[in-house]
Amino acid sequence: MKIYYAAPLFNDMELKRNSEMKKWLESKGYQVYLPQDESGLSYEMMNENNKLEINRKIFEGDVECIKNSDLLIFDLNGRVPDEGGCVEVGMAYAWGIKAIGFKTDTRALDYTGDDNLMIGGCLNFKIAKNLEELEKMLKEI
């Protein structure tokens, strides 16, 4: 199964966590597309002369990988979900690609203690709270 791992990737902690999740998923036999590894990090590649070109290349590469995935996992950790991840999970939903969430962070977005219902809907309201739940959800797909 090919998995697209959508997650924030803007600081050392996030990059490390994403890499750890990729290794964990690969140890379970999944093929994982992790944007920070495959497309690169835009802030490391661009300068004033190539910003638009680099952004377009990364966007188009990530979109193509979402389309070719069997499943998208959206890492919802953080005070609010990553904006890029929100777009990615919306694309997956629109294209009929299954998606599940992963969130160990107890902070939530709205007054009910839940994340935004539009994000939840794209995930079929399947959000794993730990690795054991995530593994169980993966086996059910």
Could you tell me what each predicted segment is?
Residues M1-I141:
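Conserved catalytic or regulatory cores that recognize and/or transform ribose-phosphate-containing ligands
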